[in-house]
């Protein structure tokens, strides 16, 4: 099931000009993820598969890799769900009011959330990244230590033995120039990450953020010139001079660990995977002497939700 939520202020012009923007390509590292069943020793196997969903209307490509870890020496089964794909940026002009005023919709945040219904026996036991991330790049290799726990090695080592642990075939990696990752209040039933805009240098000026303000020029985050003789729609910063996430979108790479009691009477679980894009409204207008910018936060939210079914006995995940 795919759903879409757009706040009531969304205009018809915005829907027509932005939502049909094609989805950016998925990360090429997907080809390195091995599917099938692997014996990692100590009476333990890892079974990996993948599921792909395209939501063209919202510009979202969801690719979910899942790995069942069956350790016969442990009383719980484990499932690692890795959420990848691309959430398109959709940075573009959406309105023009003559030559002196224009609006730009731009992605101020990207979100990925996983939710188990409250009545499910299964629980979320871990997640990666486990903390907020403010570096440009995040990388972590997931390993299993034959103790019922999956851990992440942030040094990014790939494959084989890592200390006393064994790689389960997943090295998380994503980039977020000018953005930062915030872990959103995880519980045993839900976890989410918000990759939110931090600040950006505009043509060697700034840095500017969503709240920057100058008494004369206002917010200059996406202002190409202060006094240029041009239409307002032509005075927005070129996408290739801004963060790549604005034009190309964000390619998430998060992991969630779910545990299930082997003795539970019901060995099936439902889980919802939700991708979101939040957009701000950046406006430019001519004051008679110069350009002035304003930024309205969180004006539009685009949401795509998919329910997956987990079969712990068959070690399968379907949608």
From Swiss-Prot:
Descriptive protein name: Alpha-hemolysin
Subcellular localization: Secreted
Family the UniProt entry places it in: Belongs to the aerolysin family.
Subunit structure: Self-assembles to first form a non-lytic oligomeric intermediate, and then, a mushroom-shaped homoheptamer structure of 100 Angstroms in length and up to 100 Angstroms in diameter. Interacts with human ADAM10; this interaction is required for toxin pore formation, disruption of focal adhesions, and hly-mediated cytotoxicity.
Keyword Ion transport: no
Keywords per UniProt: Cytolysis, Hemolysis, Secreted, Signal, Toxin, Virulence
PROSITE patterns the UniProt entry points to: AEROLYSIN (PS00274)
Range of residues in the leader sequence: 1-26
GO biological processes: cytolysis in another organism
Job of this protein: Alpha-toxin binds to the membrane of eukaryotic cells (particularly red blood cells, RBC) forming pores, resulting in hemolysis, with the release of low-molecular weight molecules leading to eventual osmotic RBC lysis. Human RBCs bind much less alpha-toxin than do rabbit RBCs. Heptamer oligomerization and pore formation is required for lytic activity.
One GO MF term attached to the UniProt entry: toxin activity
